[in-house]
Amino acid sequence: RNAMVKLNDGISGEGNAVVDLKGLPDTKTTDFSTLLEERLRSMLFESSAVTFDSFGKSLGEMGGIAEERIEGSDFCSPSVQMRVSPLGEVEILSTHDQLLGGPSGQSFLGSQFPADPQYGPLIAREARKIGERLADYGALGRFAVDFVVVRNEQGEWESYAIEINLRIGGTTHPFEILQFLTDGSYVDEEGLFRAPSGKAKYYVASDHLESTLYRAFTPTDLFDILIGHGLHFDQARQTGVLVHMLATTGENGRFGVVAVGDSPAESQELYQTVQDVIKKEAEEAIRPRNSRELV
């Protein structure tokens, strides 16, 4: 099987590398070490800026771990966010399905809240066990556990905890944005977030809406586009899109969005629509003026 090598201090999957171990001979064969070294030198890094030598140097400095890469049918990568109080109580804050990309699908691009109900309760139960053990060790504050889930031969979901992040992660700020916008709260027993009205809320969020085309926009432009297309967050309905991380738009053409809906389908539709609309507006903005007038 393939193996995953992870740096201890890597973030967003950029400290990960995949090693192809398929077809290697028995460890007792004379050329095993040579063949293994060849596989290691050809490992696939998640970041294009990383080389074998630089990865090896980082591994020596900060340490890391090698583990089996879980593969299977209907592969998904959810996560559970938790908190340990000063009294040692473990609280489930949220569950998410992670949106991953990059060369080997290890880079964190965004998230969908909550995690799929088919396996959300499963990973929450397993995460609580981990949280209670961490509390016994004296952990305090926020942390998250990343999982992979796959279907077994019987069609049932199996979960594998693959990483503990003892820090605030990429799913923290979109969840807090939802709390701020709606004044609602997460109901652990249901695995849902409910507004004061009792209505469940869902979102898709990303920090990686990025294109050189978007450098043409100011933060005000983005707000105007959302309002002009009726995509902005509507406080009355408590649905819509909020943009953030706007300081990087002019320089890098990058910003973030949180698309809030009353169902998973609505939040996904809003997320896709805002991408389509902003791309179209960006293409229109850079077209020569006389070309626009002829249309």
Where are these regions (language model features)?
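Generic, well-ordered alpha-helical scaffold segments in large soluble proteins
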Residues: 98, 126-133, 180, 273, ...
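Peripheral (often C-terminal) accessory segments that flank ATP-dependent C-N-forming ligase machineries
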Residues: 183-295
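Low-complexity, highly charged intrinsically disordered N-terminal segments
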Residues: 24-25, 271
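A long amphipathic alpha-helix within ATP-dependent nucleotide-binding catalytic cores
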Residues: 48-73, 104-156, 195-232
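Active-site lining segments that contact anionic ligands and/or coordinate catalytic metals
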Residues: 77, 90, 140-144, 156-161, ...
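Short conserved micro-motifs at the rims of enzyme active sites and ligand-binding pockets
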Residues: 78, 93, 172-176, 268-271
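Active-site loop ensemble at the mouth of alpha/beta enzyme cores that anchors a bound cofactor
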Residues: 156-185
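Phosphate-binding site of ATP-dependent enzymes
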Residues: 2-14, 19-21, 31, 35-100, ...
